[in-house]
């Protein structure tokens, strides 16, 4: 018989949605715990392609933070600390006698010689290759491919590993939102170093302003504090040459202190145009059949040359200064070109390269490293043995017992970020800093009206294209004229409120 009454779907729909709400996270956790699916994405977009929207969305929402190690307790943390303390060396320098340390993140930097199918008409990165030949260098294992700069950066600055975090997680946007975190900056601050970040992109990208405060940096000069006039050929990114002068400002601002300056480039950032952009490019490629990809590779290798010129300008400028200095430079991940393991001479798309430079006559000691080991290795070579995690790597990273090494790192990492901080005796040894934006002081020296009264001129120092004018805490439209002059045409209402 046919039912002719109304069918009520609402209750069924709500029950079904409730079931999905419960079932999907449970299924996600089971799948991860049994290794059916990945619990960490090195490339979020690729992860969505591989595992689909439902699992990927569920895992990025549900799977955050670190799982508590089964053996996490005070005694086991103290045992790890005791092992480190029995082997660690004493720091032999301080914030006056120590060398300046410069760390340079080379955005999406990949040595073209590492790509099996790619041929370039001439070497676009001769400075890089010269430094690789003459100073300590090696492969660098990074946690991401094609994107996710902040996660390589997190590993490098903190010595902590992304392998313990959730699917597609950015610690800058999760745990570091509310928790301070020991880093190379806080470690060096303890012995008197001044610590800086210089980056020609937006300060709030990846929530960096907050993260750098949580990691203990003193200053952060982002593009908003720079007078940027030159951009890459595709118009997307500032060129990197401005970073040299901005980095020198960090040294000049603290003449009585040694400096740690972290430089983040952006000129080689994707996307890479599949249409010709550079007229008569100096560097051309072969070995790529698709015309669009050939154009993309041509653009990329020419931008690599710009990065190489930046490296030369930086090291040339440092050579002129009478200060002991060591520089470490590394690629944060491979470019977004769809590279596979088989395309790489290393056989691994998670391997980039790092190089160094110094004016101290340090011996060349090549080693392949993980990103979270890089600065422990660098500081070790100059007699700096500070910090819980950096000392852990310095004493344990060459252990033949890899499992024990990773287990110890897991314990300390959980203890610092999510646990009771037994390794700090329960105290907050590395509180967040009062981060100062920029080196140059921005100030207003005078404000005057035009003769007609419809324009207000603001005079001062160190204005940029990103400077904003506020009247009574309300932003008004303004125009940048120079580093010393802005003007605005406030509305009659704004004028009344400013009286």
Named regions from a protein language model:
Residues 1-99, 119-139, 174-178, 182, ...:
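N-terminal secretory/membrane-targeting segments
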Residues 89-96, 103-106, 111-483:
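Solvent-exposed soluble domains appended to multi-pass membrane proteins
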Residues 487-494:
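Conserved small/polar residues in nucleotide/adenosyl-binding loops
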């Amino acid at each position: 018989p046919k039912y002719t009454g109304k069918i009520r779907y609402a209750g069924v729909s709500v029950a079904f949605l409730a079931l999905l709400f419960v079932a999907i996270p449970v299924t996600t956790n089971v799948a991860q715990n049994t290794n059916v699916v990945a619990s960490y994405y090195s490339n979020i977009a690729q992860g969505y392609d591989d595992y689909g929207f439902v699992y990927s969305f569920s895992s990025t929402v549900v799977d955050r933070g670190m799982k508590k190690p089964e053996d996490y307790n005070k005694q086991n943390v103290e045992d790890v600390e005791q092992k480190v303390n029995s082997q660690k060396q004493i720091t032999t320098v301080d914030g006056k006698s120590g060398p300046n340390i410069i760390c340079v993140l080379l955005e999406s930097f990949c040595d073209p010689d590492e790509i099996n199918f790619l041929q370039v008409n001439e070497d676009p990165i001769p400075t890089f290759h010269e430094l690789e030949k003459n100073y300590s260098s090696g492969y660098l294992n990074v946690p991401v491919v094609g994107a996710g700069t902040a996660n390589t950066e997190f590993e490098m600055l903190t010595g902590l590993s992304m392998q313990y975090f959730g699917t597609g997680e950015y610690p800058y946007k999760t745990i570091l939102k509310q928790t301070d975190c020991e880093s190379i900056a806080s470690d060096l601050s303890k012995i008197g170093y001044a610590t800086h970040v210089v980056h020609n992109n937006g300060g709030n990208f990846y929530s960096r302003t907050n993260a750098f405060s949580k990691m203990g940096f003193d200053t952060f000069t982002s593009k908003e504090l720079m007078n940027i006039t030159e951009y890459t050929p595709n118009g997307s990114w500032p060129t990197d040459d401005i970073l040299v002068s901005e980095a020198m400002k960090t040294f000049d601002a603290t003449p009585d202190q040694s400096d740690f300056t972290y430089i983040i480039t952006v000129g080689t950032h994707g996307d890479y145009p599949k249409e010709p952009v550079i007229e008569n490019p100096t560097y051309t490629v072969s070995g790529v059949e698709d015309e669009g990809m050939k154009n993309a590779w041509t653009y990329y290798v020419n931008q690599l040359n710009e990065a190489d010129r930046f490296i030369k300008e930086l090291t040339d400028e440092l050579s002129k200064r009478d200060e002991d200095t060591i520089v470490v430079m590394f690629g944060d991940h491979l470019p977004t070109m769809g590279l596979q393991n088989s395309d790489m001479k290393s056989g691994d798309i998670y391997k980039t390269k790092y190089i160094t430079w110094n004016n101290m006559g340090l011996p060349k000691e090549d080693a392949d490293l993980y990103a979270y080991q890089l600065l422990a290795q660098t500081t070790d070579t100059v007699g700096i043995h500070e910090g819980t995690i950096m000392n852990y790597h310095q004493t344990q990273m060459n252990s033949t017992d890899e499992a024990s090494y990773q287990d110890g790192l897991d314990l300390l990492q959980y203890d610092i970020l999510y646990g009771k901080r037994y390794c700090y005796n329960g105290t907050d040894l590395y509180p967040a800093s009062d981060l100062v934006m920029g080196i140059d002081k921005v100030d207003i020296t005078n404000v005057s009206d035009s003769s007609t009264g419809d324009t207000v001129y603001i005079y001062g120092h160190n204005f940029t294209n990103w400077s904003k004018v506020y009247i009574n805490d309300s932003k008004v439209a303004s125009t940048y004229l120079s580093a010393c002059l802005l003007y605005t045409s406030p509305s009659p209402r704004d004028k009344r409120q400013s009286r």
